[in-house]
Regions:
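C-terminal regulatory/interaction regions
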Residues: 242-270
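Active-site-proximal beta-strand/loop segments in catalytic clefts of secreted hydrolases
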Residues: 36-37, 47, 55-56, 84-86, ...
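Conserved beta-strand hairpin/beta-sheet module of binuclear metal-dependent hydrolase folds
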Residues: 17-71, 167-186
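Divalent metal-coordination and catalytic microenvironments
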Residues: 30, 44, 54, 64, ...
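Metallo-beta-lactamase
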Residues: 10-11, 20-21, 26-29, 57-59, 77, 135, 145-148, 152-236, ...
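Active-site HxH/HxHxD metal-binding segment of metal-dependent hydrolases
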Residues: 31, 59-62, 69-145, 245-248, ...
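N-terminal non-globular leader segments, chiefly Sec-dependent signal peptides
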Residues: 1-9
Length: 270
């Protein structure tokens, strides 16, 4: 809607700062971190092929590919690419990683639509942060699962940051549960009566409830600083094989996000 003011887009320098390379490492059996210093990408490995969640910036795609190979895997063995939300920091590298891997891209309908537009016509940011467009192969619905090689990944729709925002619940081969949580932030969004996203407030409130209700063993989020990535990696290096097992981390993340949202919503009340 042309009459709806947009939010200021973060500078590209911020995303580049988040995209510093780090070496891949194993989070737990069958789960590798292959992303950058603050933009998460995780590789779920099985004998039947692999699943990659999120693709960082376009310029990070070669680094993610190199990380997968350094971990001892082949990008061409990735069967599915999953996306949390369709902005340049989570979907920017998707076009290249899809082309290189031959994998099927799986996404919610709104994320698929926005990835096809290369991030343009963003409800909050307009055309400010484009990325290479990419076509989704499979539209996934809320609570729908895909299974591969003994693991099951279920889509949990958690809209608010974007209308298509999706968190992913993973049941690993050993029965442990991992959550890959999408952003719950509404940075500088105009929350009340947003003509481009009328359901924004009710959507994000519903997403707080959805994620707070999940009982998980391992909590991962799509930004490293949301789940203590670097601190937990250090614990892992110090010999703590359970460093990423964090059964309360998701609820703490939701509550922090909810409090920030309440403050923002209160400030915008007429």
């Amino acid at each position: 809607d042309p009459s709806q003011p947009l939010s200021p887009a973060p500078p590209l320098s911020l995303f580049k700062a988040w995209a510093k390379p780090i070496k891949p490492f194993q989070i737990t059996e069958g789960v590798w971190y292959v992303g950058t210093e603050n933009l998460s990408s995780i590789l779920l490995t099985t004998p039947a092929g692999h699943i990659l969640i999120d693709a960082g910036l376009d310029e990070s795609a070669p680094q993610i590919k190199a990380n997968i190979e350094a971990a001892g895997f082949r990008l061409t063995d990735v069967r599915y690419l999953l996306n949390s939300h369709a902005r340049l920091d989570q979907a920017g590298g998707m076009a290249r990683l899809k082309a290189w891997s031959g994998a099927q891209l799986v996404a919610s309908q709104p994320n698929a639509d926005q990835m096809a537009r290369g991030g343009r016509e963003d409800f909050a940011l307009g055309d400010a942060l484009p990325f290479p467009p990419v076509t989704t192969d499979k539209i996934i619905h809320n609570q729908e699962s895909i299974s591969l090689g003994g693991i099951t990944v279920t889509a949990l729709f958690t809209p608010g940051h974007l209308p298509g925002s999706t968190s992913w619940r993973v049941t690993l081969r050993n029965g442990k549960t991992l959550i890959y949580a999408d952003s719950l932030a509404t940075p500088d969004y105009l929350l009340i009566n947003n003509k481009n996203y009328p359901d924004l407030v009710t959507d994000i409130q519903g997403s707080f409830k959805t994620l707070a209700a999940q009982h998980v063993d391992i909590f991962i989020a799509n930004k490293g600083d949301r789940f203590g990535l670097l601190e937990k990696r250090q614990q892992l290096r110090n010999g703590d094989t359970q460093a990423f097992f964090d059964s309360n981390g998701l609820q703490q993340y939701v509550e922090r996000s909810r409090q920030r949202f309440i403050t923002q919503l209160t400030a915008q009340q007429p």
